[in-house]
Amino acid sequence: MTMFVDSHAHLDGKQYDSDREQVIARAREAGVQTMVAIGNGDGPPTLDAGIQLADKYPFMYATVGIHPHEARLAGEASYQTMEQLARHAKVIAWGEIGLDYHYDHSPRETQKQVFVRQMELAAAAKLPIVIHCRPSDGSHNAWDDCLGLIQNQWARNGLGGIMHCFTGNWAQANRALDMGFMISFAGNVTFPKAQPIRDAALQVPLDRMLIETDCPYLAPVPHRGKRNEPAFVKETARQLGELRSLSMNEIGERTSRNFYDFFKLAEIAESKVPAR
């Protein structure tokens, strides 16, 4: 069976409380070999959310980090907690972190300060970072600030990272690529009005591309409007395949290999990972 990797899933969300086991089983049946449980939780009180899942499932990895929405809640205690959590064997990245000027749930200056502090902590932990970047409607403001901070505070360390759920243009993608980042596409690449994302996806080198669901959000066409889940990552692969004149399975195989190579992980053998 062709393998797929969902490189970004919020499987701790309450949206899955009634059927989390079944959701994960469906993903495995669909060929999703590996999932990354993003460890933002609901902010500082639940920063181990991803680790709890990764501990339970041998085919999951985790991240740790404070999302820009909750930046206003960050403090020394939460930084110390993340430093400890980052040592866990299944934590492979720090994130998602970055800037969100669309919702502005935290003041922008606070977002920047927390972003920079987390880049410092990630560098000390020698972990790549997973970036959330969302500008105000019709603006590039968050992209300008986010890429500038990465250039000044991160790029030189060579650890790189992932531009998660990429929504920018090719110029922004290219700048991120130059700083050692992978570009990850989510279900919104299938949306009718997402032509700028598709234009960027046409130009991102195949060996720098990842796929994700960002579930439970952004369910791809034909599931749009429903709760997203890791099994649906195949629809993102299908759309990218159509753009690049490749099959869904070819995109799945290529992006899976990219994931394992970037994180220096051995491919998880199916025989060692029973479906749950």
Task: Tell where the protein language model's regions lie, with residue ranges.
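Mid-domain alpha/beta scaffold segments of enzyme catalytic cores
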Residues: 1-276
